[in-house]
Regions:
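GNAT-family acyltransferases
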Residues: 1-90, 95-98, 114-115, 119, ...
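Conserved acetyl-CoA-binding loop-helix of GNAT-fold acetyltransferases
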Residues: 93-95, 101-116, 138-142
């Protein structure tokens, strides 16, 4: 596999917000232009605050995607939180604009799914995309997700979104 998923601890998240070059040095990897934009800095800040309050959620938070050759932080994503009472966990992912179109999102999202199903509490994985065919919908389709509906919630999203689901594989 070309992409490694690195779970972010509080120090990773602080460096992503305040000093991306220090984060790159810590991981021995380059940070491509456009990866850590202002919209993500706010997410990293809130993820760090939540992690400091609840350290037990470490593996269910933000992750960085590391391309092994050349060694570069190619994206970010992770989970929206630990599995809920119904055994559902939600994933999200983003790849640096300069590295899109190479299958990296499929690899990273696939690894997030594999890691989620390694926890016996997880019954299915959820994802959301814009309500139109796009690169993200193709990633989910390649991984076996199925579209289960459309969500319209102007308070959360200005545009409609599609909901996707991937059930835990049945044992052979």
């Amino acid at each position: 596999m070309r992409v490694q998923v690195i779970t972010c601890d509080a120090d990773h998240l602080a460096a992503a917000v305040d000093d991306p070059p220090a984060l790159a040095a810590r991981l021995g990897a380059a940070v491509p232009e456009g990866l850590i934009e202002d919209e993500f800095r706010a997410s990293f800040r809130s993820a760090r605050e939540e992690l400091l309050r609840r350290p037990e959620i470490l593996c269910w938070g933000t992750a960085l995607f590391l391309l092994e050759e050349p060694r570069v932080i190619c994206g970010m994503g992770g989970y929206k939180g630990p599995p809920d009472d119904g055994g559902v966990v939600e994933i999200g992912y983003s790849i640096a604009p300069s590295l899109r179109g190479r299958g990296l999102a499929t690899e990273a999202a696939g690894e997030l799914v594999r890691m989620a199903f390694a926890d016996p509490r997880v019954r299915w994985v959820r994802a959301h995309t814009l309500a139109q065919p796009n690169a993200s919908t193709r990633v989910l389709e390649k991984l076996g997700f199925r579209k289960i509906g459309e969500l319209i919630d102007p308070a959360e999203h200005p545009d409609p979104i599609w909901r996707w689901r991937l059930d835990r594989p049945r044992p052979p």
